Amino acid sequence: MIKPILVFGYGNLSRGDDALGPLLLDYIEKHCDLSKIELLTDFQLQIEHALDLEHRTLVLIVDASVACINRCDFSPLTAARDKSYTTHAMSPAAVLAVYVSIKKQAPPPCFLMSIKAESMELGAGLSSAAENNLQQACLFVKQLLQQPTLNHWLQQTSY
């Protein structure tokens, strides 16, 4: 049976702050009720991940980002066919566009949690700033998952 909520964290544990997405999933696994939540992780988003959106009521995609304005940015996603559409590493919006293309319907409500990163050097550990940002993101996502409704999540997008 497919669980209604998908949390997809992507990144590389061997590349410093790029590990933020998978590390947030580790936190969720230890501190949240997973009865309605499926956790999925990978190094990067790929075309096949569009099928993971099927039969979901809410989707949260989590990634590290050096472009964050805040320590963590939380926003709704819309499908958009961008230049990553034809590459091996896709943007979250492009994955949603693939879903629309193959399923001929709108994707479930999807949100992006970007966690501010500083360095993604191969072999590096998590920076202290990223560790602090991860702690803040974990607390925020925990409260999101305690109220997994579209209305509640939309109200949190000013975070």
Please tell me what each predicted stretch does.
Residues 1-117, 124-136, 142-159:
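N-terminal catalytic or cofactor-binding beta/alpha core of small enzyme domains
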